[in-house]
Amino acid sequence: MASPAPEEHATQGCPATEEQPPRPGVPGEEAGPEGAGPQVEEAAGRVAAALTWLLGEPVLWLGWRADELLSWKRPLRSLLTFLGANLLFWFLALTPWRVYHLISVMILGRVIMQIIKEMVLSRTRGAQLWRSLTESWEVINSKPDERARLSQCIAESWMNFSMFLQEMSLFKQQSPGKFCLLVCSVCTFFTILGSYIPGVILSYLLLLFAFLCPLFKCNDIGQKIYSKVKSILLKLDFGIGEYINQKKRERSEADKEKSHKDDSELDFSALCPKISLTVAAKELSVSDTDVSEVSWTDNGTFNLSEGYTPQTDTSDDLDRPSEEVFSRDLSDFPSLENGTGTNDEDELSLGLPTELKRKKQQLDSAHRPSKERQSAAGLSLPLKSDQALHLMSNLAGDVITAAMTAAIKDQLEGARQALTQVAPTAGEDTDTEEGDDFELLDQAELDQIESELGLTQDQGAEAQQSKKSSGFLSNLLGGH
């Protein structure tokens, strides 16, 4: 928007704000904190007036252009200017040329640019038009400028520097020793810094400071960055706190579930107690002599190792001692031959035929060696189940035969006693003679058989065995 400018401003050809007289400060504002704004404006006006008086219009124009570039009102131009300043700085730092050569080159370039400008912009074409516009009109930006101007930044920096100098003077007056120590330490620091860091780097840092400080100061970039970082930190803090609280809640819930599970396991263990495998194996072990080592196999069975074999009722170990005892006492029992030949006197006294007895004795003498060999083998070797059954059946037959013989003997004795009481004495003599005849005849036949077979010694042994067997049967059947 353009509007007619005042005549005094147009005739002088400078901004209106520069020629305005400084407004006198109010005492209340200077004393209070509210007077900081007017003081800055007054300082900015004074700085602008001093620059105008010292440098003139061209330099002042360059200052305003630098203000626009350094305030980053137009970011693209400011960025290009920043890159150009960096290139120029490193060119001056790395080139072997001297300073006056560079200054002459810069002046020559400025002259060439001015000549070109004069050739392009003819005074005859646009000078009058340009002068009329600048005299009658003034360009006014209707948009309020919220950004601080470079002059204001310079004024604020000057005020801060002046306040720092005043404070340092007061500190020097109050404690000169501390002030001297502070100045010496600062000078020593810069000396060490200059010895380690080249001056080129320090100059480049000053250039960066000149470009970036207005950017952060005038555009409030630092405040914006601080607000964003603060919001991020707050979100991060809130997120970390929420995460920690969530972990605490999960841990407390896990502890509660664990305690509840432990209580339930205790209840179950009280109802269903656990049985140890070793205790169960010891209880299941059958042997009473030595505890076997028990191991639990993969298929769920017990494995007995390095122990005695469990004893059962059907085991051969139980049968073996009984067989030994039975075979040891077997010689005391009468055999079939002994049972039939034990009561020779009784048979003779009863009047049995002697011829049958003679034939039986011959058969017994023929079969006795084989039976003795079998009995010796039975005593020396362990008996099998069928042999034991056969032996028991033979023993049962012998016992039955002996019992029947004893019963018949008792009956015959009773009948003989009755006959002896009734019969006369003469009859007894004749019977006695007939018995003697039979005995003499029997003895002669026996001697003949013994001479033929040569069994005199066997007969003596048989007589002794018959006596023993008769004594055993008499003892066994004495109660009948």
UniProtKB/Swiss-Prot annotation:
Taxonomic classification: Eukaryota, Metazoa, Chordata, Craniata, Vertebrata
Cytoplasmic side: 1-42, 94-98, 213-480
Name of this protein: Reticulophagy regulator 1
Modified-residue entries (Phosphothreonine), positions: T134, T340
Motif interval(s): LIR motif: 436-441
Gene symbol of the encoding locus: Retreg1
Function: Endoplasmic reticulum (ER)-anchored autophagy regulator which mediates ER delivery into lysosomes through sequestration into autophagosomes. Promotes membrane remodeling and ER scission via its membrane bending capacity and targets the fragments into autophagosomes via interaction with ATG8 family proteins. Active under basal conditions. Required for collagen quality control in a LIR motif-dependent manner. Required for long-term survival of nociceptive and autonomic ganglion neurons.
Location in or out of the cell: Golgi apparatus, cis-Golgi network membrane; Endoplasmic reticulum membrane
Compositional bias of kind Polar residues: 302-313, 454-473
Region named Reticulon homology domain: 67-216
PANTHER family, per database record: RETICULON-LIKE PROTEIN (PTHR28659), RETICULOPHAGY REGULATOR 1 (PTHR28659:SF3)
Residues recorded as bearing Phosphoserine in the entry: S132, S136
InterPro entries in UniProt: RETR1_RHD, RETREG1/3
Transmembrane segments: 43-64, 76-93, 99-116, 192-212
Lumenal side: 65-75, 117-191
GO terms assigned for molecular function: endoplasmic reticulum-autophagosome adaptor activity
Record text about domains: The LIR motif interacts with ATG8 family proteins and is necessary to target the ER fragments to autophagosomes for lysosomal degradation.
Pfam families according to UniProt: RHD_RETREG1-3
Membrane-topology annotation of the record: Multi-pass membrane protein
Tissue: Widely expressed with highest levels in brain, lung, liver, muscle and spleen (at protein level). Detected specifically in organelle-like intracellular structures of the small and large neurons of dorsal root ganglia (DRG) (at protein level). Predominantly expressed in sensory and autonomic ganglia at embryonic day 14.5.
Organism listed in the record: Mus musculus
Any one of the GO BP annotations: mitophagy
CDD domains: RETR1_RHD (cd22560)
